[in-house]
Amino acid sequence: MRIENSEILLWVEEKPAELPQHYLSVLYLREQEEMQKIPNKNRQLEYAMPRFMLRELLNNSYSEIIYDSNGKPTMANQSISISHSKNYVAVIVGKNKNVAVDVEEYREQVMNVAHKFVLAEEKTDFNSLEDLILLWSAKETLFKLTNATPDFKKFRVKKTDKHLCGEVLNEGVAKSIKMSYFRGEKYCLVWTASPI
């Protein structure tokens, strides 16, 4: 998938019920050992699946995922982002671009916490359940891209027909970020790529 004339590799996939053996075959030995320490089978799947997906996307340029001090996944010479929901996993890779992705399933519970992340000026663009999930996903994407403090009131999002326009307020300075999105039947996906 191409965004802003830069190669972006993006993949979203529904989680299988059980961990397929071929997911394990692509893991480095250290990754296999790390995964075996995870007692919960669903968490093992969440560990293995994005690594399998990244290996498939990157072929020989795949390298081990390392997490920085903020818990953000990184890979040598490439910007990556990983997102999990209950039933989906999404990964994105960018070369010479910082990337972020978020996948969210439509769920009613978001209505109970909307007051924590919806700004007054966003209420006209984002008022249905699907819109609120899209807004949440956009703010998660901005958070992942900027490594900002997780105060979603510092993120503003406007919706156009084809894109989302995000604004991150940091120490009185606003930075604009263009995001793409896809609305599926059961989930929405938001991603972005910005120059390094």
Task: Tell me the role of every PLM-derived stretch.
Residues 1-99, 103-196:
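Core catalytic alpha/beta fold that binds nucleotide/phospho-ligands
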